[in-house]
Amino acid sequence: MPFVEEEFEILKPTKALFFVRDVLKCSLKEAQRHLDKQRLKQNQQAVRKSQIIQGVVRLIHFKPNEKTQALVFETKDFGVFDKPHQVYTHPKGYFYHESLLDCIQSHFGKNAHPAHRLDYETSGLVLAGKTLQSVKDLKALFMQKKVKKTYLALAHGLVEKSMKIDKPILTPQNIQKDLHIRSKISPLGKQSITLVEPLSYNPFLDISLLKITPLTGRTHQIRLHLSSVDHRIVGEGLYGVADENAREYLQLKRENNAPLLMLHAASLEFEFKGAIYKIASPMPERFMPFLKDLSFFY
C-alpha cells in the first residue's frame, strides 16, 4: 500500500510541524497539510501543528511503489499515468487509501492534478497537468469534447455487431444514501451516447471483448449503458443486479474484497499546443484468463 504507518520516538520536545517537515523532507506548507489531514497521532489522538511533542508518535504518509508509479508518457506540460484498478483518482477525506493524486504530486509537485477521473474500479490512462494553468487547459479539452477516449471491456453475452447506445442518464445528487450512488437511465437525464464495437468472443465463457467509445462523460456511463442492453460488464456488481446484490457489492468494496471490474481506459487522443497525441495502454493482465479461448475476431 502506498500509505504506510511508521512509529517514531522523539527524544527531545519538538514542534509537530517541524517534525513532519524533517521526517518527510518537505516544505512547511506540505507538512501542515499532513497535520491537517490528521496523519500524525500520539496516543491515538491527532496532533495539532502547533503542538510540542515528545515520546512515541505514529505518522501515516505516502510511500510510492511500483504499482502506482505507472507514468507512461510525459511532456513539459503534462503526464499520462496508467491507473491500476481499485485505486481512487482523488483521495477521500481522512482515509488512508491508495490515491493516484498522491502519485501524480510525488512526480510533479503540489500544483499537479488529474484533468479527469476514472472510477475506483476502472483501470487505465489518466491525463494530469503539471501546473495549475496546464490542468485548466487540459480540463477545457475534456469539457469541449476534444479528447477521444476508448476503453476495453469484457461483457457477458455475444455482441455480434457494432451498436450505438443513446440513452439519457440521470446522475445521482446524494451519493451517501444507500444505493443512491447509482446513475439511472431516465428521460429527466442528460443525453448520453456510447459506441460499442465487438472485437472477439469466448464461446466457452459467453463473454465478448469490446472496444468502447463514450461520446459523453456521465457518471458510470459505460457500465450503465452496457447493462441496459443486457451485456453487463464482467465483475459489475452495481448495475443490472438486484438491489440486495448491489448492497452486498458495495459492502465488499468497502472491505476491498469486491470482484474485479473488467473495464480499462485503453487510449487517449487529443491535440494540445499544436501537437497531436495518441497514447495507448496495453491489455491489462486481469483480462487474460478470459481471452484464452477466443473463437473468432470481427
From Swiss-Prot:
Enzyme Commission no: 5.4.99.-
Catalytic activity as recorded in UniProt: a uridine in RNA = a pseudouridine in RNA
Biological processes, Gene Ontology terms: enzyme-directed rRNA pseudouridine synthesis
CDD domains membership: PseudoU_synth_RluA_like
Keyword Isomerase (UniProt): yes
Highest taxon, organism lineage: Bacteria
Alphabetical keyword list: Isomerase
Sequence intervals crossing the membrane: none
Family as reported in the entry's similarity comment: Belongs to the pseudouridine synthase RluA family.
This protein's name: Uncharacterized RNA pseudouridine synthase HP_0347
Native source organism of the sequence: Helicobacter pylori (strain ATCC 700392 / 26695) (Campylobacter pylori)
